[in-house]
Amino acid sequence: MEIWTVLEDFHKTRQLLENASNGVSHLWRFCFGGDLAKLVYRAKQDYREQFEDILRECPSLFDALNLGHQSHFNQRISRALDFTTPGRTTAAVAFFAFIFDKWSQETHFSRDYQLDFLAVALWRTWKCQRLNAIPATCRYSR
């Protein structure tokens, strides 16, 4: 349930994504990242093949993100997240960390922009689902 507490705060969500990414060294993650970041990193490694399969179903996702288009990401990825259990929530965060790693390899955007975009999308989706408000108040329309 600690993961749900972290997702309540945007800055903690951003920090968790960063600490679970490949952009942070193993030593940093071990010493300063915290147990949750280590768990998310491990889940990201364990589910790597499944995450690759999901991204293959959205072949133009990174092209759209690199052009600044967010609607495709929000409709295809964010809406599909499941936060019903701590395990599924961990997998959702691991998937976003995986996307962050993949996107970092093929973009002209800064690492901070990517991290902010993904953290906002994750945090906002979490908040909307917790409020059971996705159909009405949290529609992504860009």
UniProtKB/Swiss-Prot annotation:
Broad class of where this protein is predominantly found: host cell
Protein task: Putative adenovirus Bcl-2 homolog that inhibits apoptosis induced by TNF or FAS pathways, as well as p53-mediated apoptosis. Without E1B 19K function, virus production is compromised because of premature death of host cell. Interacts with Bax protein in cell lysates.
Cellular component GO terms held in the UniProt record: host cell nuclear lamina; host cell plasma membrane; membrane
Protein name as annotated: E1B protein, small T-antigen
GO process terms (BP): symbiont-mediated suppression of host apoptosis
Keywords: Apoptosis, Early protein, Host cell membrane, Host membrane, Host nucleus, Host-virus interaction, Inhibition of host apoptosis by viral BCL2-like protein, Membrane, Modulation of host cell apoptosis by virus
Subcellular location: Host cell membrane; Host nucleus envelope; Host nucleus lamina
UniProt xrefs under Pfam families: Adeno_E1B_19K
PROSITE patterns named among the record's database cross-references: BCL2_FAMILY
Family listed: Belongs to the adenoviridae E1B 19 kDa protein family.
